[in-house]
Swiss-Prot record:
One of its GO terms (biological process) is cytoplasmic translational elongation. Plays an important role in the elongation step of protein synthesis. Belongs to the eukaryotic ribosomal protein P1/P2 family. One of its GO terms (cellular component) is cytosolic large ribosomal subunit. The modification Phosphoserine is found at residue 103. Residues 76-93 have a biased composition (Low complexity). Residues 62-113 are annotated as: Disordered. One of its GO terms (molecular function) is structural constituent of ribosome. P1 and P2 exist as dimers at the large ribosomal subunit. Gene3D superfamilies: 1.10.10.1410. This is Large ribosomal subunit protein P2. The lineage of its organism: Eukaryota, Fungi, Dikarya, Ascomycota, Pezizomycotina. InterPro entries: P1/P2_N_sf, Ribosomal_P1/P2, Ribosomal_P2. Keywords: Allergen, Phosphoprotein, Ribonucleoprotein, Ribosomal protein.
Amino acid sequence: MKHLAAYLLLGLGGNTSPSAADVKAVLESVGIEADSDRLDKLISELEGKDINELIASGSEKLASVPSGGAGGAAASGGAAAAGGSAQAEAAPEAAKEEEKEESDEDMGFGLFD
């Protein structure tokens, strides 16, 4: 990834076809040791290709891949809202039942009235 980042920096700087030596110089300028095998592979893969076209192509491919995370969150959010309203309805009924039970506990002797 660091090799690709250096390659892209050189491209942004105006070098349309950076060499392995150019990429190595960028990496060494910030204290990173370049892996010559990976660097040679990167240079051979990108040789003769336009960086902007590669980025656009990659963006199209990423956009076509479904992420899957948003659908489940929306479904679970709706289920939680439905479950929450059912619990909210049950709570007042439970409170009414408790009040009736409390009034029965003193057996009609209102000691603290």
